[in-house]
Amino acid sequence: MKDLLKFLKQQSKTEEFNGIKIGLASPDLIRSWSFGEVKKPETINYRTFKPEREGLFCARIFGPVKDYECLCGKYKRLKHRGVICEKCGVEVTQTKVRRERMGHIELASPVAHIWFLKSLPSRIGLMLDMTLRDIERVLYFESFVVIEPGMTSLERGQMLTEENYLDALEEYGDEFEAKMGAEAVLELLRAIDLEKEIEQMREELPSINSETRRKKVTKRLKLMEAFHTSGNKPEWMILKVLPVLPPDLRPLVPLDGGRFATSDLNDLYRRVINRNNRLKRLLDLAAPDIIVRNEKRMLQESVDALLDNGRRGRAITGSNKRPLKSLADMIKGKQGRFRQNLLGKRVDYSGRSVITVGPTLRLHQCGLPKKMALELFKPFIYGKLEGRGLATTIKAAKKMVEREVAEVWDVLDEVIREHPVMLNRAPTLHRLGIQAFEPVLIEGKAIQLHPLVCAAYNADFDGDQMAVHVPLTLEAQLEARALMMSTNNILSPANGEPVITPSQDVVLGLYYTSRERINGRGEGMYFMSVAEVEKAYATGAAELHARVKVRITETVIGDNGERTEQRRIVDTTVGRALLSQILPAGLSFDLVNQNMGKKQISKLLNTCYRQLGLKDTVIFADQLMYTGFRYATISGASVGIDDMVIPAEKYTLVADAEAEVLEIQEQFQSGLVTAGERYNKVIDIWASANEKVSKAMMENLSTETVINRDGVEEKQASFNSIYMMADSGARGSAAQIRQLAGMRGLMAKPDGSIIETPIVANFREGLNVLQYFISTHGARKGLADTALKTANSGYLTRRLVDVAQDLVVIEDDCGTHEGLTMKPLIEGGDVVEPLRERVLGRVVAVDVLYPGTEDVLAPRNTLLDEAWCDKLEEHSIDEVIVRSVITCDTDFGVCAACYGRDLARGHLINHGEAIGVVAAQSIGEPGTQLTMRTFHIGGAASRASAENNVQVKNSGSLKLHNAKYVTNTDGKLVIVSRSSELAIIDELGREKERYKVPYGTVLEKLEEAAVEAGDIIANWDPHTHPIITEVAGSIKFVDMIDGVTMTRQTDELTGLSSIVILDVGQRGSAGKEMRPMIRLVGADGSDLMIPGTEVPAQYFLPGSAIVNLDDNAQIAVGDALARIPQESSKTRDITGGLPRVADLFEARKPKEPAILAEISGTISFGKETKGKRRLVITPADGGEQYEEMIPKWRNLNVFEGEKVERGEVIADGPEAAHDILRLRGIHNVANYIVNEVQDVYRLQGVKINDKHIEVIIRQMLRKCVITSAGDSEFLEGEQVEVSRVKIANRDLIEQGKVPATFERELLGITKASLATESFISAASFQETTRVLTEAAVGGKSDNLRGLKENVIVGRLIPAGTGYAYHKTRNDARAKKDEPVVVNKITASEAEQNLADLLNLAGSQD
């Protein structure tokens, strides 16, 4: 019967909803929720264990304790359901209602809601325009507030202390009204007339001049408008009625031994009820004011504690000295409702066990212990047993399974056939942390895992555990098989490279197979086929590494898919010929005819996937693995102590270094070098000695001398096991071998500084006690760092996911013509990332032309795949404008064309792909590999930074970027502009190298001149900053008076005198206003002009400039008038690794940021103040001047009279992303963040596609600030979603009104997550109280657009397979709103549609 009822219950339609609104509850609303008033603080009767009447667990209010049974037991059973017992007043119904029925408490005196009082900015304070301090004094009964001044001189809202109040009473009697406590605040709030206030403020806003006042008024206005539009009333921020949570959500559980465990909420409610009842009694008794006041204050405090304990004053503690957990604590934090129960739940049909290796499995299989499978698939087995007639009832089936009858195992085999299971390893850092496999039943208790998927899971077999989940429904199984099967996840979503590459043993085996040995057994034999090679190897006629000639047959696949066979004879080895047997048809033999290291194998798999597709690759990967394991076993590669060969030269090299160190030590003692220099030099000496030793060691290890067939000695790569492991990329590296057989080298202290005495021993020789002790430092620091790093990296990932979670591909093409310009990344003389890698898989935004013509090479909207990239390289294209998510025009999502290729699938991205989450995971997952340290520049690094020339590495021709220059008397070019760059272009017009050159650089070659590799083409003095003349003439000193603005200094060694300008601070009062400068005059004494302008050629001299010329000296173009000594830049710490990435994504301002020019114009310096210079920029068109005060110690890059462009650097330093966005635009800030983040990852050798970083940047840029409102609803200075403004503007333009203008704003990821439109998503991220308070006051509604909100309300997410469900729902909703239009369709059209559908279905294979 009960089941029948449940069934009937399910038939009733659940409520469909499209959004969730949050608001303030009015007292009447709270009463309407309630099923009765709770009047007593009692919980249950401790003798009978029955709930007390009118108490906190009262059955009359909240419902029966047992299903369909009233409290006194008069009515039992189902037939009475719905009856209310006349004896005990309990409704006969399910006990489940105790989870949903609320009660209420009528408060004897109103109480302020602490969230609206204390959550900053205080809403009550803003509303009343009073300070929080004052309101608190009123609420907690320390002072009076005037409510109704009447005809008196008092003002409404004025604070009165006790004495003032008594004085006023004497003076005015009862003409005025003043109160204290929440009643007073309630009255004040009730008296506010929202519409009138809003009107007033809107009128006075334009006339306000002071910035702070304007901000305050805008804030208040926004709050008032929020209240007004949402229909909330301000007085509802004060509670008159308190709702009571349903009792089953705050349970009271009997423990054994007669004690009870209770939720803290019960204690808190009990306090409130006790105080409320006492207050009622006091009011009835008309007790003295002071007692009532005290009781009211206590009531206020107890309600505060219930809502948010510890927000004000000391937290109320329970019996165990711990603060009680209030309602606010229930929902916030990691253990709160959101993160613990809504976003992550524990699920059934899951198990976990240790993993072991399964080298015999296929890629799509995993070994599942029989015991586990039996438990996981129980319901399926019961069903099958019953269906087969082996068991009559479920109970019998249960018994059979418990006894483990033989038939059960047969049934189990059938049940799991083709039923995929999902394996997950924590921490799941990216989507490859959960994959589906077909289970294979095994004996034992450990799960077997295929070795190739270990890289994706980051799993090893040292005791890792993994969880198994069973997809139950058909849809779930389908998804697991079609999307999550390990065979479908061959490429990494982070960079599009294969993620199932062999590693360790497999690599070693394949490498060993493909090596060649001089004069091996069978060298020089000829074979007619690979089969014959196999025979020769099996019979021992030829060994694995013998160099032989073999005739091979290759399959060549043409462009049209035609397969042709070709035969040729190749020089190869026996092993490589054997490898070619597993090579799939269609791949060239050359791919295995080389030493197969890890990189080569990865490339081989990649090529296979791109050329032959998924299926062949999967089979091939498995074959590679089996082969690799087999030959690794045969090779017998193992490590013995004799494999670590210590080079003989080591001891002489170490002795030389020690002698050098002694010499430096002596120089230091005789005072020739400073302590710092000595330290740096010593470290350099040891570092280079270490390099030399390791070089000798590697040469020693990597080659051996053998006698070839002609009896001559010849060198060949060695078969030393350690060397083979490192060379193949299986395990270990040169740096680790150096510690085994070279010297351990320099060690760092825990604080990061380097200890100057290195460890000269290696592990083979063994360490002495001191050396061992020094080594422990590093090892321990490593462990501590790792722990910190994991936490930090996890937090970064969480913030990234949160900011990007709602970004989904929702349309094919937004049609924008914008894009980012991609060029190869060149740093100095190296191409760090070629153009090919940057544009592969992106869509062209603007036609790419053949160089030097107007013909289109790649039209707009082409998806650049491998073939297209080859074409671009062929025609040496070196910049392409590609579509990017940053410039995508789609509202609330992105389009497929702007995103380009789905990296994990290799084709254009599908609709509904959750690119935001994928991007966040791709950036966050390698986070644990990044370092945590900040790099100190010292020693070798600091000297390298003072370069003074450019030496080219490639020949080509010279090209200058944004450079102004003059030609000096020697015919050489002198650069007279700031951020100039010099590039080397090869004969095809591709940029090969790029260097920054400072002001005053002398170029040895003219522009466009040919240069040879190794030429030095530019020189400058790194220690001084010259001032260079652009005209020739004689010089005139102005305002240069000896002893006032300058002094003469004579160099002791040379006897030359030079003039040094005094700093303003050092001059006497006479020289303060003087501006020393050099004017250039012609032969007739007239002022010369700078060529092409009307500006007289005069050069101001800043403080401490050195002039080596005399008055009236002749000077030529390009000569230095003066030199300004550069203080060697202070050693800046470079933040590296994880902290740097976090800083970039949080868009934090650096400590001393670069100062950029706000407008274009001419520089001049105004009046100086004590510590600052006044920089003035005058625009050329005579607009408004821009002034900025800059601290004196900042090194300026500009001189008086110089022209700057907007966004140019005025003072050096790390650039702030906000400034770049403001002054140089979106494209520049995107490039800056992408390149900076990539630099950090590149240093660790991690590849991440630029797209992912762009996705995050798009989310950081999703807000804008309204600069002028036009005819829109927005307020000036308001922060709004860009897509909102765009939509509003489209409507306004359609109606012919003035659209709003806005400036994009860059928010850090935490700020951006909290500023999202969905309050549910923001609340579940951080600062829950603040977010919810703000949302409630604004009456916000959440349209459940993102992924997180939908997970929280328990729906399918609007991404992936859930995307279609949401799309149909939204279309249905739109249809409901639209007038019905009947769609007519002809038969031929229907036929065509069907054909298209079938074609589509066929193309998905």
UniProtKB/Swiss-Prot annotation:
Annotated binding of Zn(2+) 2, by residue: 814, 888, 895, 898
Positions bound to Zn(2+) 1: 70, 72, 85, 88
Alphabetical list of CDD domains matching this protein: RNAP_beta'_C, RNAP_beta'_N
Domain of life of the organism encoding this protein: Bacteria
Alphabetical UniProt keywords: DNA-directed RNA polymerase, Magnesium, Metal-binding, Nucleotidyltransferase, Transcription, Transferase, Zinc
SMART domains given in the database record: RPOLA_N
Gene Ontology CC entries for this record: DNA-directed RNA polymerase complex
A GO BP annotation: DNA-templated transcription
Catalytic activity line of the entry: RNA(n) + a ribonucleoside 5'-triphosphate = RNA(n+1) + diphosphate
UniProt: Mg(2+) binding residues: 460, 462, 464
GO molecular function, one term: zinc ion binding
Enzyme Commission code: 2.7.7.6
Note on cofactor: Binds 1 Mg(2+) ion per subunit. Binds 2 Zn(2+) ions per subunit.
Cofactor(s) listed in the protein's UniProt record: Mg(2+); Zn(2+)
One Pfam entry name: RNA_pol_Rpb1_2
Family classification: Belongs to the RNA polymerase beta' chain family.
Biological function: DNA-dependent RNA polymerase catalyzes the transcription of DNA into RNA using the four ribonucleoside triphosphates as substrates.
Subunit structure: The RNAP catalytic core consists of 2 alpha, 1 beta, 1 beta' and 1 omega subunit. When a sigma factor is associated with the core the holoenzyme is formed, which can initiate transcription.
Name assigned to this protein: DNA-directed RNA polymerase subunit beta'
Taxonomic path: Bacteria, Pseudomonadati, Pseudomonadota, Gammaproteobacteria, Alteromonadales
